Regions:
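Flavin (FAD/FMN)-binding glycine-rich loop and adjacent Rossmann-like elements that form
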Residues: 1-163
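N-terminal propeptides
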Residues: 162-186
């Protein structure tokens, strides 16, 4: 389709990646795929300097990530090691799950609205699971209250997630059974 219908005849499957006759992996797996154009697009800059950014996305956190950027360039050793900035623990903002131009849809997993670089930190299972929990909770609140997901106030979603003992801010030294957990997570 991409080559014939869209006219990108120069695009195709890499023939030097997997060593198979058809160029496909032995087992199907998507490390990266299409990502949402969301209300918010989380970038490496947002995470590396979360408190110094004017957007203050950390205030709209609905899940937590704690993994460095890891991009693999095994096919192109000439690129060498890329010095990505260290990534502190971070919050994933609510807007990455909400499409910019579509109502009544919530996206989670690896398709959230993130840049290619920070995708290396958000694609891990702990982030995917927490974001999935937030997406399901957001959809349930919207359905129960008769509104679209984008109309649900972030504080309403955060309160529901905190009632489920979810982490929405990267404060790992305060456990859910701590009396101050919910207050510190806000």
């Amino acid at each position: 389709y991409i080559q014939h219908e869209l006219g990108f005849s120069h695009l195709g499957i890499a023939d030097d990646e997997f060593g198979t006759a058809d160029g496909l992996a032995y087992l199907p797996y998507h490390r990266e795929g299409r990502r949402l154009d969301g209300v918010i697009r989380l970038t490496l800059d947002d995470v590396a300097d979360r408190y110094g950014r004017p957007s203050a996305l950390y205030r709209t956190g609905i899940s937590v990530g704690d993994y460095p950027v890891d991009h693999h360039h095994d096919c192109r050793p000439q690129i060498g090691k890329i010095p990505f900035p260290p990534v502190p623990s971070f919050s994933v903002p609510m807007g990455v799950m909400i499409p910019a131009g579509t109502d009544n849809l919530v996206v989670s997993d690896k398709a959230i609205s993130v840049s290619n670089l920070i995708n290396g930190s958000t694609r891990l299972q702990p982030v995917v699971l927490l974001t999935g929990q937030a997406a399901g909770t957001l959809a349930a609140i919207a359905a129960r209250e008769g509104c679209t997901p984008r109309e649900v106030p972030v504080r309403r979603l955060q309160a529901a997630l905190l009632a489920q003992d979810a982490y929405i801010a990267p404060l790992y030294d305060v456990k859910p059974d701590d009396p101050d957990f919910a207050m510190l997570q806000r």
